[in-house]
Amino acid sequence: LAQIDAVVSDLGVDAVKIGMIGSAFTANLVADRLQGMDVPIVFDPVMVATSGSVLADDATIAAFGRLMELATVATPNLPELHRLTGKDDPVESALSLVGKHRCAVLIKGGHEEGDALADALIEEDNMTSWQGQRINTTSTHGTGCTLAS
């Protein structure tokens, strides 16, 4: 939190990107600190590392709601979206989050099966989607963080 305060007071902030949050306690402290900031906030609700390690327990995932309420856009991948809502349909899940937290949701479709992939930006009154082809590579570590940034 001291780092947030130092950057805000010394340099100023034009936007905020929230990545991996290790506990509900930290999620709530970050939400408290960002409350009232008038800048775009991007929240990537990281739950599982590329290696498969679990990074967010149930309490942390519940606390993600506070961060989504502050966010301009949340960027969950398909498994994260399912975990946040319990719904199987990605668009229905995103609409649920948009309605509950009032932030846009960018669904990252990289976890889809097959070569054709789709991402979708769901807003209160609009949906935009993009289609593309899977790139065959082993260099996939951090792709969600890169997109969110």
Regions found by a protein language model. Give the residues of each.
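Glycine/threonine-rich flexible loop motifs
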Residues: 27-28, 51-57, 84-85
